[in-house]
């Protein structure tokens, strides 16, 4: 999928992403939850730990996004990220025995908190809002949460998503 598409029915869409830069020792996470009309329900920008790989950053961002959705009270979620390796691992029925297996196990446990959870992999173009929030978090020393308000760091990306919904 090249552009953001709304979820069906009563579900909410949760997009997540990580930003990792070679000049900084840490990662940063972004997550956005929107309804079927594309309206922002809540968004998150947060600093993360040092990561050794993009997969590690993405799987940590996924876990953070799911914790965020649970804490905000969402129970019907379409979860989307743009790292195919992470999404394939999440969808696999096999136990992940890699060095990141314990994080995948945490995610598996978190998924039991949802009445409905669908997981999908999207192209970067469909995940721009979450990526914008992850990039913004590199400037933060703390976590920022926006409730029912469009996060300023993602205004442009949200606008472009809205325009593409009506094309």
How would you label these PLM feature ranges?
Residues 1-167:
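Primary recognition of RNase H-like, Mg2+-dependent phosphodiesterase/nuclease domains
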């Amino acid at each position: 999928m090249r552009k953001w598409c709304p979820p069906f029915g009563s579900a909410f869409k949760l997009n997540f992403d990580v930003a990792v830069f070679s000049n900084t020792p840490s990662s940063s996470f972004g997550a956005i939850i929107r309804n079927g009309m594309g309206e922002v329900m809540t968004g998150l920008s947060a600093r993360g730990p040092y990561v050794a790989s993009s997969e590690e950053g993405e799987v940590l961002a996924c876990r953070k996004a799911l914790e965020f959705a649970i804490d905000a009270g969402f129970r019907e979620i379409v979860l989307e990220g743009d790292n195919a390796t992470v999404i394939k691992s999440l969808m696999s029925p096999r136990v992940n025995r890699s060095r990141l297996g314990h994080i995948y196990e945490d995610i598996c446990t978190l998924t039991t908190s949802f009445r409905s959870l669908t997981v999908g992999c999207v192209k970067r173009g469909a995940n721009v809002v979450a990526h914008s929030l992850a990039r913004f978090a590199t400037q933060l020393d703390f976590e920022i949460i926006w409730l029912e308000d469009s996060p300023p760091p993602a205004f442009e990306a949200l606008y472009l998503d809205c325009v593409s919904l009506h094309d």
